[in-house]
């Protein structure tokens, strides 16, 4: 095989494209009504062997080549430091209330590209980026309209136009942040390139149903927290914690500080468990193969507190901004009314005294100065306060809310980490109960085989039967009660299918990810008080029965040990990634905040400078009269 064949499809990313497989004219004529059947034509060189099929094949090859070239062009433009990204226009789709936004990508070397996207496609891109990169703070987009907002917009069209203009600015900032002011992994993501690809303009759903998105399980808790596309089959065996929703801002879990205390208790339980296990198995203490994750770093705990405090402060600042915008609008309306009245008054004075126009000119100049100030205030409000101050502050709030979503994901992974240990504790206790029951059953069988009417033997038999009953009741009463604390409504027992061959059990690299393996019902793992009677009736050998159950649980414990090693490694890696990314995020936010403040001060200074110049001109005019 040619070694170059390994990269045969490496550059092809335009699959599932209508334009990739054929001419886009079929979109205008999808049912082929304008087609006319005609016999194969002979080419101009007179060779009848070259038909239209050959020409179509050559044409399709050209389309493939063009798509690959376009994909490469997008990749180059994204990495171009001189790239300009703007949302230049918006338009309503035909017979629909949906608005499409035109995104223009341009650079100094005359490269220019336009692609149209709807709000739902922007949201889809961001949601999928959050799933692909669960440790990165993804730039925010405007929130979706509520039903009440839609009703208001249907009454007042000007409000809807303002919202569309706001979205245009926010979408442009969203794309600029991804390309220029975020982790390099975001702008290198294939999904971002497809979003900017005109070939995917009409088939965005295909893009989100292709790799890498299609490789991620439905529940992000069943994936590698740092690399969700990892196809390690062990992740499909992890316990699910109900209530997890990455995109929601609702977080009902305790703070990281409280979870840290729970982790300390868990580590104490693990230590006691290992000691008892060593005593029961009569072996020397051994070093764990994987270092245990023992504590949440204080830096992450401080990050959570910091984010909450900043959200509180910025939310209050948003309220002040809203009041300031209303006050500016009130000032503008007052200046408009005052300027108009002064101009009318100057005309009335001029009509009353046509011989001298000094007073009329003075009043007119004063009104003109008021009008100039009104225009300055209006420009400051529409061009500076709203787009350069109010909207960026709201964007910072959304940034911090997104960072809290990452912390929420981290909390759920901590809980999942604890649940894996709880599963091991319960499963080991189940093994101990079955082993004890097996030993008791063997003793009971031996005692009954003695066939001696002895009070001491009868007392021993009763004692063994009582112990068996107590073991069963304890097993039933304590059965997986921890799972109910997290909203579980199904059996959480970690069971491997007894009829599943060992070769098919998910392990590293198997890629069994999409569906969880059906679990054996807990009833299959329960045992009667007097199992010998049932076993004799069904002619099942009691020894093989118990040995089979014990062997099954030992296999499950082996898998649980693998899961513990996996989760230990994942939690440690996730902690390091979040620490690193949050530090980088705060540096970026600090830069954004400085830029916002400096721009606000500069624009405000320019407003007052222009107002002062207007009044100085008015003063000079008055002195010259």
Curated annotation (Swiss-Prot):
Keyword Membrane attributed: yes
Pfam families reported in the protein's UniProt record: PX
Assigned keywords, A-Z: Autophagy, Endosome, Lipid-binding, Membrane, Protein transport, Transport
Domain PX: 79-202
Predominant localisation class: membrane
Places the protein is found: Endosome membrane; Preautophagosomal structure membrane
Family as reported in the entry's similarity comment: Belongs to the sorting nexin family.
Free-text domain note: The PX domain binds phosphatidylinositol 3-phosphate which is necessary for peripheral membrane localization to the perivacuolar punctate structures.
Name recorded for this polypeptide: Autophagy-related protein 20
Lineage: Eukaryota, Fungi, Dikarya, Ascomycota, Saccharomycotina
């Amino acid at each position: 095989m040619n070694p170059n064949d390994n990269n045969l499809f490496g550059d092809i990313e335009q699959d599932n494209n209508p334009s990739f497989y054929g001419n886009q004219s079929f979109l205008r004529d999808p049912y082929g009504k304008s087609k006319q059947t005609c016999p194969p034509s002979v080419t101009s060189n007179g060779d009848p062997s070259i038909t239209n099929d050959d020409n179509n094949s050559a044409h399709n090859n050209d389309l493939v080549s063009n798509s690959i070239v376009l994909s490469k062009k997008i990749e180059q433009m994204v990495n171009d430091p001189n790239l300009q990204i703007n949302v230049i226009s918006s338009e309503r789709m035909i017979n629909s209330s949906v608005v499409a936004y035109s995104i223009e990508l341009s650079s100094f070397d005359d490269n220019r590209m336009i692609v149209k996207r709807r709000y739902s496609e922007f949201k889809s891109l961001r949601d999928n980026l959050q799933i692909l990169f669960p440790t990165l703070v993804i730039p925010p987009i405007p929130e979706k309209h509520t039903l009440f907002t839609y009703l208001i917009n249907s009454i007042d069209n000007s409000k809807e136009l303002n919202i569309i203009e706001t979205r245009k600015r926010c979408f442009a900032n969203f794309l600029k942040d991804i390309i220029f002011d975020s982790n390099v992994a975001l702008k290198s993501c294939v999904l971002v390139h497809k979003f900017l690809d005109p070939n995917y303009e009409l088939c965005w759903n295909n893009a989100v149903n292709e790799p890498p998105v299609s490789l991620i399980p439905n529940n992000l808790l069943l994936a590698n927290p740092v690399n969700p596309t990892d196809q390690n089959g062990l992740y499909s065996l992890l316990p699910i914690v109900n209530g997890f929703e990455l995109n929601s801002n609702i977080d009902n879990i305790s703070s990281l500080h409280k979870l840290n205390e729970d982790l300390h208790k868990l580590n104490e339980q693990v230590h006691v468990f290992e000691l008892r296990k060593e005593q029961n198995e009569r072996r020397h203490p051994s070093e764990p193969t994987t270092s245990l994750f023992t504590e949440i770093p204080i830096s992450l705990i401080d990050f959570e507190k910091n984010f909450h405090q900043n959200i509180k402060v910025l939310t209050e600042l948003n309220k002040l901004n809203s009041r300031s915008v209303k006050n500016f609008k009130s000032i503008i309306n007052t200046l408009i009314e005052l300027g108009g009245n002064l101009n009318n008054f100057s005309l009335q004075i001029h009509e009353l005294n046509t011989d001298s126009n000094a007073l009329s000119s003075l009043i007119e100049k004063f009104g003109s100065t008021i009008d100039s100030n009104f225009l300055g205030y209006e420009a400051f409000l529409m061009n500076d306060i709203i787009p350069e101050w109010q909207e960026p502050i709201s964007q910072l709030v959304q940034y911090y809310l997104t960072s809290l979503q990452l912390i929420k994901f981290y909390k759920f992974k901590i809980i999942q980490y604890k649940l894996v240990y709880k599963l091991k504790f319960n499963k080991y206790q189940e093994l101990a109960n079955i082993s004890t029951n097996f030993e008791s059953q063997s003793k009971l069988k031996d005692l009954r085989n003695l066939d001696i009417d002895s009070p001491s033997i009868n007392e021993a038999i009763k004692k063994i039967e009582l112990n068996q009953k107590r073991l069963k009741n304890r097993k039933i009463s304590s059965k997986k009660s921890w799972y109910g604390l997290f909203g579980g409504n199904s059996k959480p027992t970690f069971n491997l299918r007894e009829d599943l061959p060992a070769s098919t059990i998910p392990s590293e690299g198997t890629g069994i990810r999409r569906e969880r393996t059906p679990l054996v019902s807990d009833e299959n793992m329960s045992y009667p008080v007097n199992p010998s009677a049932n076993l004799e009736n069904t002619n099942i050998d009691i020894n093989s029965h118990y040995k089979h159950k014990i062997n099954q649980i030992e296999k499950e414990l082996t898998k649980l040990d693998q899961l513990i090693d996996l989760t230990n490694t994942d939690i440690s890696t996730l902690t390091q990634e979040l620490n690193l990314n949050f530090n980088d995020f705060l540096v970026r936010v600090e830069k954004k905040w400085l830029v916002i403040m400096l721009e606000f001060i500069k624009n405000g200074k320019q407003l007052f400078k222009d107002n002062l110049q207007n009044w100085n001109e008015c003063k000079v005019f008055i002195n010259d009269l």
